[in-house]
Regions:
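Sec-dependent N-terminal signal peptides
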Residues: 4-13
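Sec/Tat signal peptide C-region and signal peptidase I cleavage site
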Residues: 14-19
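N-terminal soluble domains immediately following signal/targeting peptides that reside
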Residues: 20-166
């Protein structure tokens, strides 16, 4: 798993430099026991997200600094609410979209789930961009209660699950 993490950290910027034929996102999800929250950071290529928004919502949407950032945040929040489903202890959770920042060739999105009490399991269903790119792969790095696990999600296997026994 450590090698996969290192590979992805190196590969993402390199792949971004060229016109990419690979479709993937990377999400880091960390449980904060003191704040009773799951903090997530998702990285998605600009052009892939833009294509999804243009096909799904409005052909004029641009995922860049020239587009109205409040509108862009609203589209990102709406899309993530539909495509990123978090369940804690078997119960679906409300996502709190915090915002995004622009990086070279990709968008970094910040999301949080709050009010997590007595954590026994976390399930993450991630279908980001799979409706536009069937070959899309979504990597999840999950860190909670001393456990670290990475998942590679695809169209046929789009759910990650981590259980904690007392």
């Amino acid at each position: 798993m450590k090698k996969l993490s290192i590979l992805l950290l190196v590969a993402l910027p390199l792949m971004a430099a060229a016109a990419h034929k690979y479709y993937f996102s990377v999400t880091q999800a960390d449980y904060d026991a003191q704040e009773h929250s799951l903090k997530m950071v998702t990285r998605v290529f600009y052009d892939d997200l833009e294509k999804a928004f243009q096909e799904r919502y409005d052909a004029s949407i641009k995922v860049d600094a020239t587009y109205d950032q409040d509108k862009l945040d609203a589209y990102i929040q709406r899309y993530f609410d539909q495509k990123l489903i978090i369940s804690v202890n078997g119960k679906p959770q409300q996502l709190n979209y915090i915002g995004h920042k622009d990086e070279v060739d990709y968008v970094v999105c910040f999301i949080e789930v709050t009010g997590i009490q007595d954590l026994r399991s976390i399930a993450i269903e991630n279908t980001l961009l799979m409706d536009v790119f069937p070959e899309q792969k979504n990597v999840i790095h999950l860190n909670a209660k001393g456990k670290k696990k990475s998942f590679l999600l695809t169209e046929g296997n789009n759910k990650a699950m981590l259980n904690f026994s007392e």
